[in-house]
């Protein structure tokens, strides 16, 4: 049964409301705005019937303070008043009230207004749930598509298989610990998954060369940042996805590539991915070496603080490292 809170300083008006709708709804009757706010601190209702003209705290003030409460911020409100001033009605509706009913109440009109507002609120919640479900489905599909593209690219080199997925995982952990908002973290995850997409344009004989690269070959490898940014530049739905590909090899002291950006000039997503990328590279076996030990990896990360890596983000990453949150790769991975 739907719960309705009726607030009016007139006992007679509250009795009229009770007689009109009793049996259809669970009803709570209160005589002041103060009582209503105290009640909503610990209780939820489906609708508030709120008298406009009350002593001490009128309906307008009660409404404003009600919207500040967790249990009152979204509840529909119908204002009740004997006031014939049209401006009052306009003001109430502009504030977000669901309806405005004048006294004396017509029982059938009152019941229909209440029914209509509750049905509309129920429909609104239903549509919100559907939108959330569809959004979650789209986000899941987006992640799976991006992860598949990433895996296809890394299939060219068994030594980097799963690299982008792990970089995304570490980046998300860092951003969560840093207090980033949910949508920003989701964007970062997608950006990290595609940060190395530019390697699709690097020849296999350079990408998978077991020995030391020549100066010319290293220049070709470095071009993956530009190639990746060019591939991703038309994606507008994920902010900074181009920046993640272009700038993840920049260094905090300005000696990185491709643009030699320094400190805050480097987008935050790229600074985070840069740390996660370097960690995974050290934590993974390569064609020319085994994975490094935890002690060596930590030492290398610390040595890069303020030169290669953003000090703030690195400190957070080291916390995760020391807590054992960053998994060691198995040889079979």
Model-found features: residue ranges?
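Two-component/phosphorelay signaling modules centered on CheY-like receiver
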Residues: 2, 11-29
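Receiver (REC) domain active-site loop signature in two-component systems and cognate sites
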Residues: 54, 62, 66, 92
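Metal-dependent catalytic cores of enzymes that make or break cyclic nucleotides
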Residues: 147-333
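Helix N-cap/capping motif at the beta->alpha junctions
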Residues: 29-38, 59-61
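C-terminal output helix
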Residues: 101-114
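Active-site beta3 strand of CheY-like receiver
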Residues: 43-50
């Amino acid at each position: 049964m739907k719960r309705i809170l009726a607030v009016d300083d007139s006992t007679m008006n509250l009795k009229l409301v009770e007689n009109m709708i009793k049996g259809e709804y669970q009803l709570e009757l209160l005589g002041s705005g103060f009582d209503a706010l105290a009640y909503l601190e610990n209780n939820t209702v489906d609708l508030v019937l709120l008298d406009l003209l009350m002593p001490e705290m009128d309906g307008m003030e009660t409404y404003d303070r009600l919207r500040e409460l967790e249990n009152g911020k979204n509840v529909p409100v119908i204002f009740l008043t004997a006031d014939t001033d049209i401006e009052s009605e306009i003001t109430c509706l502009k504030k977000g009230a669901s309806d405005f009913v004048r006294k004396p109440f017509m029982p059938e009109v009152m019941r229909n207004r209440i029914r209509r507002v509750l049905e509309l609120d129920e429909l609104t919640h239903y549509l919100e749930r559907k939108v959330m479900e569809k959004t979650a489905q789209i986000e899941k599909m987006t992640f799976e598509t991006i992860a598949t593209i990433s895996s296809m690219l890394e299939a060219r080199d068994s030594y980097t298989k799963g690299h982008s997925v792990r970089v995304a995982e570490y980046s998300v952990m860092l951003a969560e610990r840093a207090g980033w908002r949910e949508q920003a973290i989701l964007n970062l995850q997608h950006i990290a998954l595609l940060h190395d997409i530019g390697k699709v344009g690097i020849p296999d004989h350079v990408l998978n060369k077991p020995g030391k690269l020549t100066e010319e070959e290293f220049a070709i490898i470095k071009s993956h940042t530009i190639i990746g940014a060019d591939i991703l530049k038309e994606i507008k739905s994920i902010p900074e996805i181009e920046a993640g590909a272009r700038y993840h090899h920049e260094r905090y002291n300005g000696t990185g590539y491709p643009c030699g950006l320094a400190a805050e000039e480097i987008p935050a997503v790229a600074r985070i991915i840069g740390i996660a990328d370097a960690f995974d590279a050290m934590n993974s076996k390569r064609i020319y070496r085994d994975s490094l030990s935890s002690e060596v990896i930590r030492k290398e990360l610390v040595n890069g603080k303020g030169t290669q890596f953003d000090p703030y983000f690195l400190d957070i990453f080291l916390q995760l490292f020391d807590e054992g949150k960053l998994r060691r790769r198995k040889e079979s991975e």
